[in-house]
Amino acid sequence: MSIQDLQRKSVEYRKTILKIIHHAHAGHTGGSLSCIDILNVLYNHVMNVSPDTFDDPTRDRYVQSKGHSVEALYTVLADKGFFPVEDLDTMEQYGSHFTGHPTRDIPGIEQNTGALGHGLSVSVGMALAAKLDKRPYRVFTLLGDGELTEGSSWEASMTAAHYKLDNLVVIIDRNKLQITGPTETVVALEPLADKFAAFGYAVRQCDGNDIAALVETFDRVPFEPGKPNLILANTVKGKGISFTENVVAWHHKVPTDDELSRAMAELDRAAAEIEVMA
């Protein structure tokens, strides 16, 4: 898929995210919009996983540790054909499997997540299993920067480096905001890249909302033999909509009818700009 095709996907994915959150009257808007470009590139360019290969023991694995941004994951899985997109209309309804965090009841989801700080530990176990079983699959996991205050993330990091898990790719959605404010105000994380390097990762940084930059970075994995890979993806919370970008309140805010209409108009303009550049 070309860069422009991926850019088109991101616009459509953002529309879907906003529609399902608006319809459900619940969801995590800001974090889903910040990470959707990452998921787009993973599922449409990087990973060997599809509805046809999901039972294949050699498939790549994806674990969304920042489970609260599940709307982004649901959007991509529906587009890939794991389930009909119409199923998303049931999100957050009584009896629906489409809840506010990922569960294995949904086709295409590898692991239940939601309690922050656990996804990396699970991913390390999967990557170690691949090494022990001599299987070629890779394990990708997406963490929010806010969950890095969980000690389990650093325990898992030490383990990943100890076992030289160069088949593990950790992506940090570094949007610099969490539910109560800026990460550097809540619990300062910087110098984050240096910390991960000290824990034994091969670290690379990129613009996590730039499709071309993401493609280039993922294409270089593994970065260094014998080291787990870490991509520090610098993103914007609420990316793609002028009035949601870098606004703490949009962590869990649901768009009103008027806000949804305005957002759709902005995304239509973004789509038109892509066509002009084609």
Q: Could you tell me what each predicted segment is?
A:
Residues 1-13:
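N-terminal hydrophobic or amphipathic helices/low-complexity stretches enriched
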Residues 17-20, 32-162:
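Cofactor-binding active-site loop characterized by glycine-rich and histidine/acidic residues
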Residues 74-75, 103, 152-154, 180-184, ...:
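Short acidic, glycine/serine/threonine-rich loops at helix termini
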Residues 69, 80, 175, 210-211, ...:
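Short, glycine-/Ser/Thr-/acidic-enriched flexible segments
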Residues 10-26, 173-175:
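N-terminal capping segment at the start of a domain
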Residues 211-278:
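Glycine/aspartate-rich loop-and-adjacent alpha/beta segment that forms the canonical ThDP
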Residues 63, 169, 205, 230-232:
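Structured core elements
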Residues 108, 112-115, 120-223:
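Thiamine diphosphate
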